[in-house]
Amino acid sequence: ATSDMESQMYPSVEAIREFLAKDDSKPFICCEYTHAMGNSCGAMHKYTDLTDTEPKYQGGFIWDYIDQSIYKKDRYGKEFQAYGGDFGERPTDYNFSGNGIAYGGDRDASPKMQEVKFNYQNITAQVSEDSVKIINKNLFVNTDTFRCEVTLAKNGHVLRTETLDTAVKPLSQQTYRLPFGKQQRPGEYTVTVSFLLREKTLWAEAGHE
């Protein structure tokens, strides 16, 4: 009764739905909902998808951002990121501190970062045979802020990359024809739609996807 929001730790998606069905007087935010240790974050889409159907569910926090590791040299003088147990200490939590979506040290993106990046995107592209539906989930930003590139590949090999002019207003959607038609020759064709920064920002260079 004294808080402005409801917060729980690692509830299931169904538990969140059940809670909001009984009491939606406050927004629901998971104080922690995925643990980015090892090869993880594979099911987080179930939670991010929930934001599309439950307005009072407003997301959550990942544990955590950066591996809690430090530089150490091995016996050959080569640096590596060390964690529990690498200094001969006992007891220890071993690699339990290595649970970030960015590596320690230079903070390079780990493979888990790609999963997080995809699920946190504010623009969705739904591709059909000859068109693409662009859904803009941004609250204030038009899609013309970005350069939209559409890439056609066959059996994993890029055939063409074209620019698609889009201008989808915030919280709306629009369908555009693809710059290439339906392919007739046999093979597995894939279409990749990317939105890239037109200009450099404080957090990324121009061209960042």
Residue ranges with predicted function:
Residues K200-E209:
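Short beta-strand elements
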Residues Y10, T166-V168:
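A short, sequence-level motif marking secondary-structure junctions
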Residues A1-S131, N138-D144, E149-H157:
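Extended substrate-binding grooves/exosites of carbohydrate-active enzymes
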Residues S131-T166, T175-P179, G187-L197:
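Beta-strand-rich binding/interaction modules
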